[in-house]
Amino acid sequence: MDQQPGPVQQSSPPNLTNPRFTLELEFVSSLANPYYLSHLAVTYPNLLGISKSGDEGETSNESSDPEAKAFAAYLAYLYSYWKTPEYAQFLTHPGATLRALRLLQEETFRRDIIRPQVIEALAGTGVDEQGAQDTQEGEGEQKQNKEEDAQDAQENTESKT
């Protein structure tokens, strides 16, 4: 009865000898690279809710694709605990990694990362995501607030070391 409700199922503390922990650490660390995000979008468009037919009008693709829903839930699960200082301390690039995980929570971003302009904007901006905001309509302020949250998590991690 000590179980807490919610998506976080990672109850044990982070341990580098735990295969699941190291696998997830490697995966979330890879997300810091915008070109890896591009690779995911091109190679596995179904996971990100991207239409293979190229129809721009299809916006409900994710809701009809169980793989996209499952992957979105997995990304939410990863973000829920990697943003905590206990786990973020293991990230080599916490700002970029948490930014990518946060952005991947948004269906529009998952759908738009197949566009080269979005990837180039992410690659050219580092921690500041102004370029990525230009590619998203009306979500700039929300993204900026979330970026500040990621920076706070990074500062918390740095203060513990």
UniProtKB/Swiss-Prot annotation:
Q: What is its main location?
A: nucleus
* GO cellular component terms attached to this protein's record: mediator complex
The keyword Glycosyltransferase is annotated on this UniProt entry: no
Q: Name one GO molecular function term.
A: transcription coregulator activity
Quote the subcellular location field of this record. Answer: Nucleus
Looking at the record, which segments are called Disordered?
A: 124-161
Keywords assigned by UniProt, alphabetized: Activator, Nucleus, Transcription, Transcription regulation
List this protein's GO terms for biological process.
regulation of DNA-templated transcription
Quick check: keyword Ion transport in the entry? no
Locate the coiled-coil region(s) and give their ranges: none
InterPro entries assigned to the protein according to its UniProt record, in alphabetical order: Med31_sf, Mediator_Med31
Gene3D superfamilies, per database record: Mediator of RNA polymerase II, submodule Med31 (Soh1)
**Top-level taxonomic group:** Eukaryota
The similarity annotation says: Belongs to the Mediator complex subunit 31 family.
Summarize the subunit comment. Component of the Mediator complex.
What the protein does comes down to: Component of the Mediator complex, a coactivator involved in the regulated transcription of nearly all RNA polymerase II-dependent genes. Mediator functions as a bridge to convey information from gene-specific regulatory proteins to the basal RNA polymerase II transcription machinery. Mediator is recruited to promoters by direct interactions with regulatory proteins and serves as a scaffold for the assembly of a functional preinitiation complex with RNA polymerase II and the general transcription factors.
Which PANTHER family is this protein grouped with? MEDIATOR OF RNA POLYMERASE II TRANSCRIPTION SUBUNIT 31
Q: What is this protein called?
A: Mediator of RNA polymerase II transcription subunit 31
Q: Which organism is it from?
A: Aspergillus clavatus (strain ATCC 1007 / CBS 513.65 / DSM 816 / NCTC 3887 / NRRL 1 / QM 1276 / 107)
Organism classification: Eukaryota, Fungi, Dikarya, Ascomycota, Pezizomycotina
